[in-house]
Amino acid sequence: MAALYASRRIAQHGVKEHCMKVLVYDTHSYDQTFLNAANQGQHQLDYTPAQLDLQTAALAQGYDAVCLFVNDIASAEVLERLAEGGVRMIAQRSTGYNNIDLDAARRLGITCMRVSYYSPYSVAEHAVALLMTLNRRIHRAFNRTREFNFRLAGLMGRDINGSTVGVVGTGKIGTIFAKIMQGFGCTVLAYDVRENPECIAMGVRYVPLDDLLAASDIVSLHVPLFPETHHMINRESLARMKRRAYLINTSRGGLVDADALIKAIESGHLAGVGLDVYEEEQGKFFRDLSDRPMPDDVLARLISFPNVLVTGHQAYFTEEAVTTISETTIRNLSDFAAGRTNENTL
């Protein structure tokens, strides 16, 4: 395929081949820092803090491509607006892409590319951090000691060593999480539609999901969000979980039915819950809402529990991961502009 874009002149860098005009949605200062470092002036990157939706699609008028993040909405109607404005490529700067209507994108001739790999260690390690913080009540101890309260009542945890850990999804992240938990001396069970030979070689035992839930002291979710996995953790599956188990979700918020989860927490069925994602996080996560009432009663209720720890989709957020995400995004833009596909093309 011939190169799609003529060269443009960028003042401080001279003429660059296949330069694209790109609008980067949902950006913060750190996004700009890392993307600019990766870009090296090759493409014209314009930034907006706005998230993509039907109203903000007009901002992309006249752009060759848009760069999106997990909470940007690229529905069929939004994609039609983008296509009308000249957009022919979406650079998704994440692994997940359930926010993009791929069928509509293909129909409209919009190529979509993602970051298929960055640092699986970042997410796996954050899942462990959530677990350990919950189990040893670190968040509660931190708040106490800041007020010079050094009492231990209410801070008792459990040994992780000897626990049974259920890993739901054994891709790169799930496999690394399993390795870490084996290092703690845990027995690791797994569920996935495809068994990973690496996990089998490690001694991980694959079992049906119901068996995993019933046997595990800790359940950690590492699967993508598809119609088949939506609300896979629901009233029935929560009831099957071992009493006083921990549930960790660093994958996608839609995997968990939040209303059912609240009932399981209120009943005392779960020892604790660590969430880095939330089904209705769009418009809330990545934003400072500290000066206004929380607009989501379900999220507010979850945060109010002393044995629930919520972080704002930060599991991926390490220097190494953001560097790789930025470099891969720029490579995707450059390959598309030069008429090439790569392993990240959806």
Which sequence ranges carry the predicted segments?
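Short glycine-/small-residue-rich Rossmann-like dinucleotide-binding loops
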Residues: 70-71, 217, 223-225, 251-252, ...
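Phosphate-binding beta-alpha-beta segment of Rossmann-like dinucleotide-binding domains, i.e.
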Residues: 108-164, 176-179, 183
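Rossmann-like dinucleotide-binding domain for NAD(H)/NADP(H)
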Residues: 244, 252-346
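Rossmann-like dinucleotide/phosphate-binding beta-alpha-beta segment
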Residues: 153-243
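An N-terminal-biased, well-structured beta-alpha scaffold segment characteristic
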Residues: 21-112, 234
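Short beta->alpha connector loops at strand-helix junctions that form conserved
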Residues: 69, 93-94, 110-121, 210, ...
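Short, Lys/Arg-enriched N-terminal segments with co-localized hydrophobic residues
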Residues: 5-19
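Short acidic/histidine-rich motifs immediately flanking catalytic phosphotransfer sites
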Residues: 60-65, 85-87, 214-219, 242-245
